[in-house]
């Protein structure tokens, strides 16, 4: 009895075995799994009589498969269709497979079959699962594909053997393997063109030697003879800071101060303010370079009073007995060059074009420390007053001078008050001002070259001043005593 088929599936057709040999019997009809697995039956024979010799010759001879109980021979070829499916059950011992009938022996059109893998799961073997014989990588990557990997990927590079030299030229720092090459190199040596120099080497090395030793501006140190070496060592011993040398330098310094030679040559080469380390130190420790003040109102008042006093009155020393030598020593060496010229006020008769030109020149020549808004506002106010006043009749020159002075003072006072009111956000956030302002002017080349001569001239002037004070050449001491008594 046939097994029931699922709904929608066609029923298995009844297979009628063709007349022939017993080995060509069809499988039983009661198992539809075998019907699904087996290919269609072969076409019917053309000859009327089955089993004749011509018909048997046309069919290829296929060896019958052994029964289920016996093992196939060692050299027998097992066809894929002859293997049982993975869900087939072995027949009982007493009953032969397929009711004592063997299955069809055929060669499948496609080389697929169901087989059992070692782990128990079915594998579907097809022709494209054949072992790879060709690499899909280009030929340039042949050493890096999966089929041609080197045994040791990290192949160490072979160390090059260092050449062995038997002849050396110490001056040129070169080595040679044989005597011939060494002789050729020594024949190329040339002597230094200087008269007192005995240096000899290759032409290029001689050029470097001349640039480093004999070029103009280079210090000439001759250490060729033992006498020169001994003299050089003696000079170095004199300058070495031993205790005796330190005491000797102190005595020389005291003698110079007594004579009046106080000034020393400025070391222009150090440039302490421009170095990177000093700038970084200022950034890291701002407290050392800034002077803090408490109270913004007090600071405004102090600044306002100071500016007003500076504008109204020139600085006059309060002390009567002032040492001129001390004033010269503590004064800046460049004070005569850096004196700031006072701002000229535009007269009333000047045309507007000339006024703008002079105001622009005044802005350029003005000091950098003062705010830029104050002088501009002052000049604008003065010009406005000068434009209004020409309609009035001219007065005496003294009266004009007084009026201009008053207007200038009023304008400056107003500008200072307005400038103090306008405080920037930076000044509000940081109530500090730099204690040491950076130097805006750098020394010129001529000044640096003439530094020793300038020092000598100023020391001579200081010596003259010291002599005048000690000898009371002008009678200043007697006059000062009389004024004190009065």
UniProtKB/Swiss-Prot annotation:
Q: Write out the annotated subcellular location.
A: Nucleus
Zinc finger regions (C2H2-type), where? Answer: 167-189
One Gene Ontology BP term is: positive regulation of transcription by RNA polymerase II
Stored SMART domains: ZnF_C2H2
What lineage is on file?
Eukaryota, Metazoa, Chordata, Craniata, Vertebrata
Q: Does the keyword Zinc-finger apply?
A: yes
Residue ranges of the region described as Disordered: 1-71
Q: Which GO terms of the molecular function aspect are on file? A: ATPase binding; identical protein binding; protein-macromolecule adaptor activity; RNA binding; snoRNA binding; zinc ion binding
Which gene carries the instructions for this protein?
Nufip1
Disulfide topology: none
| The protein's role, per its UniProt record | Binds RNA.
Q: Which Pfam families match?
A: NUFIP1
Q: What is this protein called?
A: FMR1-interacting protein NUFIP1
Q: Which residues carry this modification: Phosphoserine?
A: 331, 333, 335, 396
Motif: Bipartite nuclear localization signal; annotated at 236-252
**Keywords of the record:** Metal-binding, Nucleus, Phosphoprotein, RNA-binding, Zinc, Zinc-finger
Subunit structure of this chain's protein: Interacts with FMR1. Interacts with ZNHIT3. Interacts with NOP2, NOP56 and RUVBL1.
Keyword Disulfide bond among UniProt keywords: no
Q: GO CC annotations? A: fibrillar center; nuclear matrix; nucleus; perichromatin fibrils; pre-snoRNP complex; presynaptic active zone; protein-containing complex; synapse
Which organism does this record belong to? Rattus norvegicus
